[in-house]
């Protein structure tokens, strides 16, 4: 049961422990690509008719190459190494699911400035808070596949958590409702009597 508010800013030491574990196990690697380099790589892949999947060049850098990049002022961002195995789970809405993680890039978990993207703190918090159900929109199926691999890399058994992916809410025109676009909110629905 929920009985307290959790602030991620007070849990940074837990995230740091997870980062150390992922680095030690070889599942977190430094990348020095700039946004411009990544955009160029993405455009080249797309123009060749290939999916824009990161080529893991950061994974293959040697110590001398890393030192050289850092001496020019480059600061790494950190990517999680997906293991290429399909992520599988029983979805409470969609039934048995399998997602091929070879179809996506290794996700960035830590930005150049050292701040965390949503993915890592979310998994660490789910584990430490004993979350049992994750219910979200079906547009997050890819995130689930990634998070399952992070759960496993941190030594957590994914069966502890049940996933449910709901169809997205749409307006009458079929466009998805979005907070960012100022779409109809639950508050609006409640005020209209629904």
Language model regions located:
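Short, intrinsically disordered, charge-balanced linker/junction segments flanking boundaries
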Residues: 1, 191-194
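A glycine-rich helix N-cap at a beta->alpha junction
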Residues: 1-7
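Active-site cores that bind ATP or allylic diphosphates and position pyrophosphate for catalysis
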Residues: 8, 21-190
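Conserved N-proximal alpha/beta basic substrate-recognition cap immediately N-terminal to
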Residues: 18
């Amino acid at each position: 049961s929920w009985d307290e508010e959790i602030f991620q800013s007070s849990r940074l030491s837990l995230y740091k422990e997870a980062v150390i574990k992922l680095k030690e196990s070889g599942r977190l690697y430094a990348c020095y690509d700039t946004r411009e380099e990544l955009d160029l790589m993405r455009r080249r892949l797309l123009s060749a008719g290939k999916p824009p999947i990161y080529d893991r060049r950061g994974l293959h850098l040697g110590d001398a190459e890393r030192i050289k990049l850092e001496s020019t002022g480059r600061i790494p961002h950190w990517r999680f190494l997906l293991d290429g195995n399909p992520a599988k789970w029983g979805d409470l809405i969609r039934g048995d699911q399998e997602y091929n993680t070879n179809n996506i890039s290794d996700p960035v978990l830590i930005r150049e400035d050292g701040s965390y993207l949503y993915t890592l703190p979310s998994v660490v918090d789910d584990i430490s808070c004993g979350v049992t159900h994750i219910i979200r929109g079906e547009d997050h199926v890819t995130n689930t596949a990634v998070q399952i691999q992070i759960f496993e890399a941190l030594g957590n058994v994914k069966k502890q958590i049940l996933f449910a992916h709901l169809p997205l809410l749409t307006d009458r025109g079929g466009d998805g409702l979005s907070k960012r676009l100022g779409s109809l909110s639950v508050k609006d629905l409640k005020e209209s009597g629904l």
